[in-house]
Amino acid sequence: MKRIKSGDEVIVIAGKSKGHIGKVLRVVDDAVVVEGGNLIKKHIKPNPQKPENKGGIIAREAPLHVSNVAHYNPVTKKADKVGFKYLESNGVSKKVRYYKSNNEIIDRI
């Protein structure tokens, strides 16, 4: 089980977007794409075969390494470490993630 999943709220702790809080749009190997974070300008060449592609300069999110982001705890309003523990429900134990500062569970059971 990975510490950061798609849909988690994270804070950028290093880089040009340091301090930015946003949702994880997708996870790619050891990199994450954060909504509104690490924006780059991409130059698009016009393509006459595709009328929707007019070309120009667009801003989009670039991936960040997972070591440069941390989970954002909405209760403490700070970056937080994530731990794993097993919870039992209906006789089946399930591995869940939780915030280490206040033991609040991140995953839904």
UniProtKB/Swiss-Prot annotation:
InterPro entries: KOW, Rib_uL2_dom2, Ribosomal_uL24, Ribosomal_uL24_CS, Ribosomal_uL24_KOW, Translation_prot_SH3-like_sf
GO terms classed as biological process: translation
Keyword Chaperone recorded: no
Keywords of this entry: Ribonucleoprotein, Ribosomal protein, RNA-binding, rRNA-binding
GO MF term set: rRNA binding; structural constituent of ribosome
GO cellular component: ribonucleoprotein complex; ribosome
Key word tRNA processing present: no
Task of the protein: One of two assembly initiator proteins, it binds directly to the 5'-end of the 23S rRNA, where it nucleates assembly of the 50S subunit.
HAMAP family: Ribosomal_uL24_B
Record's subunit section: Part of the 50S ribosomal subunit.
Entry's family note: Belongs to the universal ribosomal protein uL24 family.
Stated name of the protein: Large ribosomal subunit protein uL24
Name of the encoding gene: rplX
